[in-house]
Amino acid sequence: MKIFNTWAIALMAALCAQAQAQTKFSAEDFAKRPEAWEVALSPSGNYAALAVPTADGMETQLQIVELATGNTQVLRFARQQHVIDVVWTADDQVVVSRAKMEPLKARPSTIGELMSSDIKGSNQDVLFGYIPDVGNKRGRRKDEGWSTITKVLNGEPGMALVDFTCWNCGDEPDTVIFKVNTRTGDRQEIERGDKLATYSFDQTGEPRLRTTWDDQDEPVLHYRQKKGAAWTPLPKSIAGYKLYGARFAADNNTVYALVVDDKEPAQAYKIDLEAGTRSKLAGRSDVAVSNFMYEGMDGVPFAVTYDADKPSLQYTNPASEWAKLHAGLMKSFPGQMLSFSSFSRDGNKVMFVVWSDRDIGSYYVYDRTTKQAQKVSDYKPWLKPAEMAQVKPIEFTNRNGEKLFGFYTAKGTGPKPLVVMPHGGPFGVHDTWSFDSDAQFLASRGYAVLQVNFRGSSGRGDAFLRSGWQGWGTKLQEDIADGVRYAIDNKLADPNKICAYGASFGGYSALIQPILYPDLYKCAVGYVGVYDLPLMRKTDALDGASKRTKRFFDRTLGTDDKALAAVSPVQRVADLKVPVMLVHGRDDKTADFNQYKAMEAALRSAGRPAETLVVPGEGHGFVKPENIAEFYRKLEAFLDKNIGPNAK
């Protein structure tokens, strides 16, 4: 680890930005796992905890690094297990979530079990999870559910609040809040709520705000004026239609939260619960506030961020010392974004992460007394930012006159062979101005990449999200095609060299686009896609999904199988005239493997067999780096002969 002052940070950033001899990075370079998934600063400010994948990628270890010396203690919780979501509950105690690698995710995902350890690894325990019986020994834990730390009680070292939801307790299981001693595993139930309740806590750890869901899947908001008081409806005059991201100030009455009044983009508010009033801190009419930035561990906000177009921030309190610190650090990293991620208890040390469209990110610790910064970890240092492609935010108007955002990734200028890459979901997610491994790999091979945040994407408010419902094969596809025409009209794309590629819903879009807009495309690549929408509805109905999940799919996809068949690539295969590549995990349970089989058979019957890649043991997207790298190489070869240098 290296220590340097703020002017040295600026010099280092400038040197890193200088162009160097261009390197052709391998598929393995983009597929390789990072040096650390995440980093968290201890409350004392003396240690950093790093979730570090092993060289073979089969597990994640927790490394405890003493910042002053670099001395490292490696904690292993279980062989071939991953851990994530590192939380310090005391100066010498950490809690992690047991995790597994999830397809299409940039990092491991929790499986709902919590484990604790002291920093020497000598006292480890399962706090929440299922420990099976072994021989005559009965497992101590039999928690069949999902657990998450929701608050660390900073005034009580080692104590935390855990949210627990049962796995097998019906469609709407109770949410139980436990106060847990993370050193001993002792727990005490302090709150129980139905209707999938979620809670916000004041700084004493008292549940004060609660969100549940009615039978129409709309949010219901309640609050508790003080400990022991009854839950009462939160007035819409302060809570609006929806309130989330709430945090209590030190007075345990003032709340900072994101509020949606009538399905518009979320705005940032300061709320006085006792007075029943609120004041707006920040917000835009076209883009939702995505997050607050806070003054230290338990402080008030000094800024908000937006990320639906190019990420930006707005200082809500420019006079704050924290705002000044943030602005000063930002000057040391021009063209990048910087977020505070964790703090020491006294606020003297701050961990921050720096990232951009060309840089996945690096973690630093800044000492406010010495004004020195210490780099703790890079995410993928072998991918040199100066040799990555720029991600350019774009804005255009669709055929209905609606403003849409998107991103264009390419090296250099001028019309290029274009890969159109719709995001998955399709609802409630959106592409961002950030490092995307798929896009950067393709850009390194000479292609431009277009990503469109079509109607139904998140980050623009509930009205924009809902405007895409029941538009899988219509409205959403119109927006993608309008984005392609924008790229052509603005000399960003070679109109004779365009291919569609995507995963999940993006895989569906990749195949339906050349059916609906045959004049635009020369090829299509479907990766773990859905190609028969009526079959998807039938499969999901038999799959044990909850009533709430089924209602959501009916509401967002539609229930008219005839109409859905009309926009399904399997049923429209006669209109699919371009070369196709199909890629799927044999164990995919999200876009069921039957989807791949139906599409492959339809293309074969039509006399236009697809190029294929099927990998046993993989699911909804590939997890193993070697399989991701193999896919990248096959994707490169397919594009090369259809829109690349060897295209006819």
Where are these regions (language model features)?
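Non-catalytic accessory segments flanking enzyme active sites
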Residues: T198-S200, L313-G412, S437-Q440, S444, ...
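Positively charged n-region of N-terminal signal peptides that target proteins for export
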Residues: M1-T6
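Cap/lid segment of the alpha/beta-hydrolase catalytic domain
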Residues: W382-N496, A503-S504, K538-D543
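Flexible loop/turn segments at secondary-structure boundaries
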Residues: Y241, E264-A266, A288-S290, D309-S312, ...
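Active-site-proximal cap/loop segments of hydrolase catalytic domains
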Residues: F454-K648
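Alpha/beta-hydrolase-fold serine-hydrolase catalytic core, especially in secreted/extracellular enzymes
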Residues: D262-F292, G296-V300, V304, E321, ...
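Conserved hydrophobic/aromatic "anchor" residues
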Residues: L41, L50, W88, F396, ...
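Beta-propeller folds
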Residues: W7-A14, A21-V350, S356-D359, Y366
